[in-house]
Curated annotation (Swiss-Prot):
GO terms for molecular function: glucosamine-6-phosphate deaminase activity; identical protein binding. This is Glucosamine-6-phosphate deaminase. The keyword Hydrolase applies. It comes from Mycolicibacterium smegmatis (strain ATCC 700084 / mc(2)155). Its EC number is 3.5.99.6. The gene is nagB.
Amino acid sequence: MEVIILPDPGRIGSLAADAITALITRKPDAVLGLATGSSPLAVYDELVSRYEAGQISFRQARGFTLDEYVGLPADHPERYRNVIDTAFAARVDFAPGAVQGPDGLADDIPAACAAYEAAIRDAGGVDLQILGIGTDGHIAFNEPGSSLASRTRIKTLTRQTRVDNARFFGGDLDQVPTHCLTQGLGTIMEARHLILIAMGRSKAEAVHHLVEGAVSAMWPATVLQMHPHVTVLLDDAAAQRLQLVDYYRETYRAKPAWQGI
C-alpha cells in the first residue's frame, strides 16, 4: 500500500488522472472502476479537461460503477448511473453502453447481482478502480460487518451512511434509500490497481484504520491491506491521525519519477 499526501484536491485529482492516462495510453480498451461521491470529482474533472484538450480518449474503454441504490426511478438525479454520467461518463467519449452499473430496479435482485459479476468477468476484470471511503470505513456500500470475501449483493445501509448521504437528497434523510446493490469486497479486490481517495478531517479516523489498523470486517476498507497494488491519496486533514505520516511524506519525496503510482 502506497500512501501519498498532497496539499489540495487539484493535486490529488491530477495524480490519479496521470495513472488513468498512462493506463489508457498503453491499453486503450482498459476497464475502469468508477466511484461516485465527492472524493473522485477532482479526478473526473481533470480527465474531462485532458479529453477536451485531445490528450486522452475513452472510445475503446469500458467502465463499471461500484454500487446503486435500490428502488430509485431510472431518471432520478441521485441514481448512481446518472451521477456517473453527469460527473464524468457523458462528458467524454465512452461508446454507448460502455459504462454499466448494477440494476437497482431489477425484479430478481440475486440474478441481477450475478449478472453484474458476470459482466465484469466477461470484460476481463477491472484494470483500475477508483474508491472513496466512508467515515465508518466502508468502501462502495460494504458497511461495517461485511464479509471480506463478499460478492455483488443487496445491502441494508447503516443510518450513518444514510445521514452522510442525505446532503445529496436535500438534507432529507427520509428520501435516502435504505437498500443498495454493491460490489463486494471480494469483487473489488480482484481489480488490478486500486486508487483510494480521502479528503477532509471527517475521514481521518477511517484512514487511520485503513492504513495502520488491523484487518477487520468492522472497518471494511482494511481488507485493502491485502491487495498487491493500492494507492491511497490523501490531503493533510485526512492524514492527520496517521502515526507514520512523516515517513509517508519522505518516501513519496524520494520516489523516482519513472515509477508512477
